[in-house]
């Protein structure tokens, strides 16, 4: 990862120098973003911050250098932002919101909530989440399975060493043991502030957070309904072993059922 950062810095510098040579730098917005694909335990495919919170760096005209923001944005907001910066209107079919106001005012807010989802990725899965302020709410429709991550995480030395330690009776930290938790809760609620930055303390059953839980439930349900989402009734089976990460080969392993198929979500042009 350190080498990737060094390479990024070098090649972005090359692009900047080329833009300068063409006298185009002052009229160019540079955007760097990354996916959530690091294959580490409790990262890739997880709907907590370590799985969903990704880098987003921008520079260009109207963007104050060396500033940062805590405002909530989603990846679907990038396209509307580019269009606004280019002076173009956003098509009605776009779900995202332009975060151009944040570029000139880091304290500006463009959205109250951001949503995430996890579907089949080497293993059966259906997870949905909503982030509002400091609260994160997650539902899991396959709680009988450990949320271990994809095959490249399960087969990694870090995951296998943790499994070896667990099986030998060594005490793991709550963060380490979480990847082996089975069954898992069907609902999770976290306060992502300094009190629980790693999302370890599930507040879903805490009566003090009942109002927050009900609010987050409704927000997520409304989003699921608006996007015509649904849980697959005949999901594709696991393609890899949960413990070893080795390939499983079976007949009729893959299903044509998927999230949203029951409600024909693929025909939805613009969620309301």
PLM region descriptions:
Residues 36-48, 59, 195-198, 206-207:
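Active-site His/acidic residue clusters
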Residues 1-2:
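Short glycine/proline- and acidic residue-enriched helix-loop micro-motifs
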Residues 53, 170-187, 194-272:
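Long, internal low-complexity/basic segments
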Residues 37-39, 63, 99, 120-122, ...:
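Short, solvent-exposed loop/turn segments at secondary-structure junctions
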Residues 86-188, 211, 263:
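C-terminal cap/loop subdomain of S1 sulfatases and analogous C-terminal strand-loop tails that border
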Residues 6-13, 73-80, 94-98, 184-187, ...:
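A structural signal for well-ordered alpha-helical segments within the folded catalytic domains
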Residues 13-21, 43-93, 97-112, 201:
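Substrate-binding rim/cap in mid-to-C-terminal beta-strand-loop elements of soluble/periplasmic
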Residues 7-42, 86:
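Metal-dependent active-site segment of extracytoplasmic phospho-/sulfohydrolases and closely related
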